[in-house]
Amino acid sequence: MSANHTRMIDLSKFAEAKNAALLTFCSVWMGAIITLLRSPDELPLGFDYAFKASLTVLFIAAIISLKSLMPKFLNQVHKREDEYKNLLYFGDIDQIGTGAYPGMAADLYTPTEGASATPTYLHDLAVQTAIHAKIAHRKFRLFNWAGSLVLFAFGIMMVPPILFCIRWAVNRLHC
């Protein structure tokens, strides 16, 4: 169970790294597009319209990527029916405080002789594993949305050269 918990944390970290990279990618492209749009020279082939539309789509993708990096707290992903404190969750540890935490952890998590773990520890670990799985799933889902928007933005930027090629080919056929 501990290995599975570690795996869920690793998946969350991986998804977060992907979203951070996508946010950086969007930021660089938005900066480049803004630089091109601010140029005093007119952009060829209608790129100004494509860049303006792409800029909007990239901005939305960047917002989604940024949203995925925002932390989720236990009460946002797991509804409790009592005042139980999960001593594996940083928010509960913070509420308990430094003075009380070591004693509570020892009372709840020290196994009896012959046992490798307490039922309370296994329960808390299972809850944390499930929560990290939800968080990782959310981060990957948001990455897919943002990544799809980035691909859509690139599709928009491809419209002017594709139209140019089509016009060029049609003009060659009429010769």
UniProtKB/Swiss-Prot annotation:
Pfam families xrefs: PycTM
UniProt key word Nuclease: no
Molecular function via GO: nucleotide binding
Membrane topology: Multi-pass membrane protein
GO CC annotation, single: plasma membrane
Entry keyword annotation includes Transmembrane: yes
Alphabetical UniProt keywords: Antiviral defense, Cell inner membrane, Cell membrane, Membrane, Nucleotide-binding, Transmembrane, Transmembrane helix
UniProt-listed GO biological process terms: defense response to virus
Spans through the membrane: 17-37, 44-64, 146-166
Subcellular location: Cell inner membrane
Free-text function comment from the UniProt entry: Pycsar (pyrimidine cyclase system for antiphage resistance) provides immunity against bacteriophage. The pyrimidine cyclase (PycC) synthesizes cyclic nucleotides in response to infection; these serve as specific second messenger signals. The signals activate the nearby effector, leading to bacterial cell death and abortive phage infection. A clade A Pycsar system.
Protein name: Pycsar effector protein RsPycTM
Native organism: Rhizobium sp. (strain PP-F2F-G36)
Lineage, uppermost ranks: Bacteria, Pseudomonadati, Pseudomonadota, Alphaproteobacteria, Hyphomicrobiales
